[in-house]
């Protein structure tokens, strides 16, 4: 066993261990449960069944020898896992498809979010008593903890879990009780955030396609088995197993009869590695397509239809008081002009009540995500520009709206060339006015069909950065997307990159479709088909554009990815 550190996404260092390392062996990553640390995993890593694997594990933030404090955002733990996978791939020349990941309890939530949101091409996953929903024994416990976070920003709560409800093994109970590195505290906001993440993953596990095995402890006094079963039943994985372990407690790895779990786990891992499916699937995912069709046909209970009809009526009646709602009603809530207003995030309206309505509107979770998407988009664009010679940078945005974030780039990097394709005349007029006002050169608009493959030959332009932002989810048909992707792949400079956004999950899809109008005009609804990150990445991969980096907001709504030609 070696003790090491890696740099995570935010520049902090995280402690990790490696066992049994030899080149060309298959690799396991193990994520420990909350409150614990990676050294406790020795019990599994040194078992003879697992000596044939390279094994890596790290101490989560706020745990063990990792010095960083706990983060209140559960997505930071998912980003850490993404950073760790990238690190061991680079440091040890390990292929992504040769990695299998095992996670216990809270670690299972982190791992599930990683495969759902980042869609890595790993071999498979094992979830041991995943904590999608924690058992709360005090009435209104979640509400009380939420209130505590409002009163005290860095509030902590103590775990009620005792060693005697983790394992029947007395020796393991004693080890747990005497381990000074075990931390019984947990950040209160993180506890709430993990609960919300667990709920999201259970409801949307259809987006997960990897081989998955779940071990559920029959006598689990810490988490609810019902959530694990619902998660399993929704999975799209063709290879999956759910095993309920009779008389087992929550700490499955440390239980008395752990050897039978180790055997089943090893058998599953070997089978996965032996029968890996590397076929690229670019077909529309059935769950997403059906969700889109149900929304388009408005096939919802009458109570929901009435509820959203009231919202729509209220918005059309009183929306004029809010500047943001007024712009949405006039130009479409998904229009470039509407998004410009969202980005500014400055409440405006008629009278005090108008400003109040506008602030409520701007604070909606979807709009907060859109603003975060812009930040992430700018971050990846700047990262790519800085890897190139500024004066030789040529950017193409296939559907750039008014050019909002591109103007931020032009202001910071005046030497670059920017071409903005946009079909909406009102957006072009707004954008051209900004260009004229700033006396910018080498930035202009064109008006072509971004879904016509021939467009990209006609423009006679060889970009080294292509941007596709906020457009693909507006169209259901994957063939249209392939026309765009294949077209840009043909003209992209060999050292170039495509930066594209995704929307793997959105809590307001139904509300948006039934209440808000689109930029397409004639009162058409703002209807979207979200795509799982796996589906979206596969469409780019088909044309040899391989995702190298991805950023995501804390709520898991919008992704921004950078792909390069293989």
Residue ranges and their predicted role:
Residues 208, 214-216:
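Short beta-strand/loop motif that positions the catalytic acidic residue
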Residues 402-414:
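Conserved SAM-binding loop of SAM-dependent methyltransferases across substrates and taxa
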Residues 322-386:
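Class I SAM-dependent methyltransferase Rossmann-like catalytic core
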Residues 495-502:
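Conserved beta-strand signature within the Rossmann-like core of class I S-adenosyl-L-methionine
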């Amino acid at each position: 066993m070696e003790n090491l550190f890696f740099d995570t996404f935010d520049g902090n260092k995280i402690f990790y261990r490696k066992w049994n390392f030899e080149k060309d062996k298959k690799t396991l990553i193990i994520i420990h449960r909350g409150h614990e640390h990676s050294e406790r995993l020795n019990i599994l890593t040194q078992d003879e069944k697992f000596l044939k694997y390279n094994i890596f594990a790290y101490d989560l933030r706020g745990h063990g020898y990792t010095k960083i404090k706990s983060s209140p955002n559960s997505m930071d733990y998912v980003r850490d896992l993404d950073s760790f996978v990238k690190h061991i791939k680079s440091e040890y020349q390990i292929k992504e498809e040769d990695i299998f990941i095992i996670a216990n309890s809270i670690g299972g939530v982190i791992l599930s979010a990683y495969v759902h949101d980042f869609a890595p091409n790993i071999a498979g996953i094992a979830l041991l008593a995943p904590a999608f929903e924690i058992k709360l024994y005090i009435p209104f416990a979640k509400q009380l903890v939420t209130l505590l976070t409002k009163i005290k920003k860095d509030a902590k709560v103590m775990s009620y879990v005792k060693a005697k409800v983790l394992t029947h093994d007395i020796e393991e109970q004693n080890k747990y009780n005497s381990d000074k590195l075990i931390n019984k505290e947990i950040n209160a906001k993180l506890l709430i955030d993990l609960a919300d993440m667990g709920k999201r993953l259970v409801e949307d596990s259809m987006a997960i396609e990897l081989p998955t095995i779940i071990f559920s402890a029959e006598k689990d006094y810490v988490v609810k088995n019902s959530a694990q079963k619902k998660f399993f039943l929704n999975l799209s994985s063709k290879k999956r197993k759910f095993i309920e372990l009779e008389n087992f407690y929550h700490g499955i790895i440390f239980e008395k009869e752990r050897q039978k779990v180790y055997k089943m786990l090893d058998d599953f891992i070997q089978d996965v590695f032996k029968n890996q499916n590397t076929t690229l699937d670019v077909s529309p995912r059935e769950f997403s397509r059906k969700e889109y069709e149900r929304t388009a046909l408005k096939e919802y209970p009458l109570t929901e239809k009435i509820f959203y009809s009231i919202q729509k009526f209220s918005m059309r009646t009183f929306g004029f008081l809010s500047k943001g709602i007024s712009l949405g009603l006039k130009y479409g809530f998904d229009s470039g002009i509407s998004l410009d207003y969202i980005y500014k995030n400055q409440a405006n309206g008629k009278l005090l009540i108008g400003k109040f309505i506008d602030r409520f509107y701007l604070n909606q979770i979807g709009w907060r995500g859109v603003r975060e998407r812009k930040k992430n988009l700018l971050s990846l664009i700047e990262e790519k520009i800085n890897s190139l010679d500024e004066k030789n940078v040529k950017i193409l945005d296939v559907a750039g709206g008014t050019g909002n974030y591109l103007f931020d780039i032009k202001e910071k990097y005046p030497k670059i060339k920017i071409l903005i394709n946009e079909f909406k005349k009102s957006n072009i007029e707004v954008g051209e006015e900004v260009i004229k006002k700033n006396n910018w050169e080498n930035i202009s608009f064109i008006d072509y069909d971004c879904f016509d493959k021939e467009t990209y030959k006609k423009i006679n332009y060889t970009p080294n950065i292509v941007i596709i932002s906020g457009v693909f989810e507006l169209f259901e048909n994957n063939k249209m997307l392939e026309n765009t992707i294949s077209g840009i792949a043909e003209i992209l400079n060999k050292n170039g990159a495509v930066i594209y956004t995704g929307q793997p999950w959105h809590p307001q899809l139904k509300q948006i479709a039934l209440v808000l109008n689109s930029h397409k005009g004639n009162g058409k609804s703002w209807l979207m088909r979200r795509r799982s990150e796996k589906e979206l990445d596969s469409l780019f991969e088909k044309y040899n554009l391989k995702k190298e980096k991805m950023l995501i907001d804390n709520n898991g709504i919008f992704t921004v990815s950078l792909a390069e030609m293989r």
